[in-house]
Amino acid sequence: MKNFFSFSKLTPHLKNIYHRNMTYTTKQVGETGSLEYRLFFLKDNKPVSSFHDVPLWVNKEKQIVNMLVEIPRGTNAKLEIATKEYMNPIKQDVKDGKLRFVHDKYPFNYGALPQTWESPEHTHPSTGAKGDNDPLDACEIGSGQGVTGEFKQVKVLGVFAMIDAGETDWKILCIDVNDPIASQINSQEDIEKHLPGKINEVYTFLRDYKIPDGKGPNQFAFDGKLQSIDFSMKIIEETEAEWKDLVGGKTKSSLSVVNTTLNDSNTVTADVAAQKLNF
């Protein structure tokens, strides 16, 4: 996959998405539901990477992180961060030249935690498998439907140790801090009390969503049990450290690490990024 997607002939569409304590603008290139579709991010009208420039932590002591919504609840287009492309826009995954859709609609908002990375060079002792080369995934179980490109501030509630095609693929369970019942949910017991059956619903979906495509169920460490908040925080910290090794050049990778805010060897000015993107 090329590190830069050519879209000079496509018309960008500007859309504002407001976030708590920060405002991002998304710029869409190509039509939704097309191979050309890309959703780029700007802050203060300057290009930023959704992977590298948006901070992970909102309040570490309270286990609150930023989550980028890729696939809103109730939808099934397989949207994801384009980790190998310049400035890491969101795109729709492609398989055999066709846009990818999951058979069943997601029963939660699905997305990723910025400034995290599951290194394919690291075998995790809990799973016996190497990382899947992507940011940490997150499943947000609040009542509201997210929007693709929205950054939610979410409270960490647990993690599933999924093993997908032989690779470690952690799934953080979380809830939007602005959800009406977020303040009442601080443990697995609280989830079962206020959202009975939700943990099993998330687990079952993650386990079985590839079966209609002719594949077997995904595997899980810990017998598929949701792990504690403390364990989840350790996983987030580990993948944050692996991300730092990625952008710091300690781990070699084909992923794009270009950014506009980190002030490292991969940082470019906003003007350079905008020119490259034809913004």
From Swiss-Prot:
EC annotation from Swiss-Prot or TrEMBL: 3.6.1.1
Keyword Ion transport part of the UniProt annotation: no
GO function terms (MF aspect): inorganic diphosphate phosphatase activity; magnesium ion binding
Record-listed Mg(2+) 1 binding positions: D132, D137, D169
BP GO annotations: phosphate-containing compound metabolic process
InterPro entries for this protein: Pyrophosphatase, Pyrophosphatase_sf
UniProt keyword terms in alphabetical order: Hydrolase, Magnesium, Metal-binding
The keyword Glycoprotein appears for this protein: no
Annotated binding of Mg(2+) 2, by residue: D137
Entry cofactors: Mg(2+)
Catalytic activities: diphosphate + H2O = 2 phosphate + H(+)
Cited Pfam families: Pyrophosphatase
Binding residue positions for diphosphate: R100
Annotated GO CC locations: phagocytic vesicle
PANTHER family, alphabetized: INORGANIC PYROPHOSPHATASE
Similarity field: Belongs to the PPase family.
UniProt protein name: Inorganic pyrophosphatase
Organismal lineage: Eukaryota, Amoebozoa, Evosea, Eumycetozoa, Dictyostelia
